[in-house]
Amino acid sequence: MLVIDAGQPRNRFAEHAHGFFGQDGKPPARIVADAAAQLAAYPTVQRIAGETRTAERDASGRFHVTLADGSRASADRLILATGIRDVLPALPGLAERWGVSVLHCPYCHGYEVSDRQLGVLATHPLSVHQAILIPDWGPTTWFTQRIVEPNEEEAALLDARGVRIERSPVVEILGDAPRIDALRLADGQVVPIDALFIGARTEMASDLAQQLGCAFDEGPLGVAIRVDTWKQTSIPGVFAAGDASSLMTNATFASASGVAAGVGAHRSLIFGLDA
C-alpha cells in the first residue's frame, strides 16, 4: 500500500486537537507524526511526502496518479483522503486567529473557551443555529453581518438562550493575535469577545475527485464526495474517506471513515467491485 501525504491537514491551524478520543489535547502535527511512526512498522506500507496533481483510470480499471515532482504511481484501488479547506470571510485580523481564538466547532473547542465572552459571526443563514447552541459554553453575542434575520421561532429561542444580537457588521478584530480582545463594529461599537465561532464555508482541498468524475452531494456549507456504506464513490474502484466525503466533519468521523474505506477497498479486491 502506498500513502501519499501532502502534509496539509485541515486542523494544522489549531494549537491542539479536541473531540478526538484518545488524542485530546495533542498538537495536530504530533498526531500525524505519531501515526507516521506507527505506519513505519508495517513492511507492506510505503509513505511518501508529496502532492498528487492528477489521477486517471485506464480502460482496464487501473489507476494512475502523478505527483507534483513528476513521479507516477499506479494501483488497482484508490482511496481519496484529500480533505477540505475552510473558506474564511475577508475580515481584517481573522485569518491569523483561525484555529486559536476564531473557531469553527463548539464540540471541538467549546470546553477550552467555556465561561468566557463568546461570539458567533454569521457567514450564511444557518449560523443562527450555531448562535442558539453556543450559550451552553458561555455568554454569547450573535453578529448577523446583515446576512440573516431570525424567524419568529428562532428569535424566541435566541431570546430564551440569552443571546445578544448585533446587526451592525463586524469590521475588525482587535487584540494581539492570535488572541481576541474585542470586535469593532461598523457603527463604532467595540464589543469585548474572547473567542469567535464561525461556521465557515468549505471547498475541496484537491480536485482529484473531479478529475476522476466522482459524484458529489451538496451540503449547506459545501460539497462532499458521494460514497456508499463501504466508502466507494460513484467511480468503481475509487473510495473516499475523511472530511472530503462527509457533510458532518470531525477528526473522529474522518478516522472512522478511513477504516471503512480501507476495509471496503480490500473487500473489493477479493470479492469484486459489486460485492
Place the predicted regions along the sequence by residue.
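A Rossmann-like FAD-binding core segment of flavoenzymes
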Residues: 33-67, 72-75, 138-223, 270-274
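Beta1-alpha1 glycine-rich phosphate/pyrophosphate-binding loop at the start
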Residues: 1-33, 117, 125-148
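Phosphate-coordination loops involved in phosphoryl transfer and adenosine-cofactor binding
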Residues: 49-50, 114-116, 235
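Solvent-exposed alpha-helices and their adjacent loops that cap or buttress functional pockets
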Residues: 58, 70-72, 95-97, 109-114, ...
